[in-house]
Amino acid sequence: VNNSTGLVETLEAVKPYYDEAVKNGDPVGIACAMKNAGVGVGIPDWGRCKLIVEEDRKVHIYSGASCIGQGLGTVLVQMTVTNTPLRREQIVYERSNTWIAPDSGDTSGSRQTLITGEACRRACELFTAALEGKTMHDLIGREFYGEYYAKTDPLGANKPNPVSHVAYGYATQMCVVDKKTGKVESLV
C-alpha cells in the first residue's frame, strides 16, 4: 500500500474514538478492509454505454452488462443525472439486450459501477456537448457512445509497482466491547 491509497485516512478517522475508548479502559477491536474493483490482473476489462435520444425526447441508456441485483440501472441513471443537465424524468434505463446494447464484459457490482459507470460518464460528455444550444427534439435519433478500458498488469508482471486493479476501496471499523457482557457496545 502506498500513499495514493486511502487506508491510512480510514485509520486516522477512527483514531479519536479509539484513543477515547482506551483512555476509558474499554476493550476495543479494529478491522481494516480493502476491496478491489474491476477484473484486473491483465485480463481485458472494458465497459461500454450508449445513450440514444429517442422519439419521447428522453435519453435512453443502453449497456450490455448483466444486472444481477447489483443495481447497475440505478448507477447508470445516477451517472447520467450527475453528468448531464437532464432531470431524472428525462432518462430511461433500458435493460440489457444483445440487439442494441454494447457488450460490457463480466459483471459484478463494483466492476460495473466503476468500469461501465466511466463509459457512461464519457457518453454523457458527448451528449452534453451536442446538446449545447440545442433541444432534445434536435437530437432525436442521435447516439452517444462511451467506452472505458481498464488497463492493468498481469500477475507476475516484471516491472516495479505493477497495477493489479484500477481502483480499491478501503474501510476501517472499530468496536467497543462491554466488559461485563462481552457484547459490542458501539461500532464506529
Regions found by a protein language model. Give the residues of each.
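Cofactor-centric catalytic regions
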Residues: 1-84, 96-188
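Short acidic capping loops at alpha-helix termini that bridge into adjacent secondary structure
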Residues: 87-92
